């Protein structure tokens, strides 16, 4: 006998941390009245690794391999912000060629991140076919990364004052070929997805956020731009050499899950435009500021010196962070990724506060899912785009 659920007879359900749609180790405690969501409480911290404290016990160069583990699907952005802070504190000039290569890598990383958001998002909604097409394109981006950096993920490619290595011979032509191919791929996704009536039914009008509400919650990235706010740090902060390229900020005014999807799809085509312009106009010259190598360098050990046997153990070149405070930020695929850095006249930062976009964007989830159906939780959570590595840090 089925007893209808009344207002007093709520059901409490645990979603996660092993649920296939939870995008990592996220747990939601959901209170249900039948199919309607009454309340939702996210439980975080399953992937906490003490990243801020580790930073305070490492030099910047030693810490660089760690930062790729925050948002492990868009690692170029975490590397960029880690080197941008010391560069600003130390007034270190980045060569033009290195800046162009950084922009190319950042935009490729943005495309890879958006693709890896789109595939599982479609699978959560019930569309399996686009998932395989999307991963085919993402594989090509990872091939480009592997050719340039040696790694498909966790690239460890950015350095203070430049990058680790120049682009290999033939890489630029290969990347231009990918850009032409990918534009046809995006058109294919839009044919498959954007006007699909079942897809529209699942996302249109679901999880609406108004512009003022988005600002009050501190949202950033596609979450903010989908609510009618034209705010992109690449235009606002003028970092790297984005001002030298012709591109537009992508935004929508509806504020629902469909608008967030459209913003990300449009951003991928804008990223291709930026990459094509950067590849065609890439200047010659050095790919790193060679003066950085001379920081804090002890005299070279001599043949008969006791220290000579430890030559392979010599510390990495580093420099003292001046006694200053600095907040530095970049426009990551998920929003504003920032670091509040306090130097203390030593090689280690005194404080290293990470502002992860996913953590702040996730805070609005309980408000968005209230009074919605249980099945809408997947759509709304998927449209926020979170990675638990950077949420829990």
Curated annotation (Swiss-Prot):
Its main location: plastid. Pfam families: Complex1_49kDa (PF00346). Its EC number is 7.1.1.-. It is found in: Plastid, Chloroplast thylakoid membrane. The keyword Coiled coil does not apply. Keywords: Chloroplast, Membrane, NAD, NADP, Plastid, Plastoquinone, Quinone, Thylakoid, Translocase, Transport. GO terms for cellular component: chloroplast thylakoid membrane. One of its GO terms (molecular function) is oxidoreductase activity, acting on NAD(P)H, quinone or similar compound as acceptor. It catalyses: a plastoquinone + NADH + (n+1) H(+)(in) = a plastoquinol + NAD(+) + n H(+)(out); a plastoquinone + NADPH + (n+1) H(+)(in) = a plastoquinol + NADP(+) + n H(+)(out). It is a peripheral membrane protein. One of its GO terms (biological process) is photosynthesis, light reaction. InterPro entries: NADH_Q_OxRdtase_suD, NADH_UbQ_OxRdtase_49kDa_CS, NDH1_su_D/H, NiFe-Hase_large. Belongs to the complex I 49 kDa subunit family. NCBIfam families: PRK06075.1, PRK07415.1. NDH is composed of at least 16 different subunits, 5 of which are encoded in the nucleus. HAMAP family: NDH1_NuoD. NDH shuttles electrons from NAD(P)H:plastoquinone, via FMN and iron-sulfur (Fe-S) centers, to quinones in the photosynthetic chain and possibly in a chloroplast respiratory chain. The immediate electron acceptor for the enzyme in this species is believed to be plastoquinone. Couples the redox reaction to proton translocation, and thus conserves the redox energy in a proton gradient. This is NAD(P)H-quinone oxidoreductase subunit H, chloroplastic.
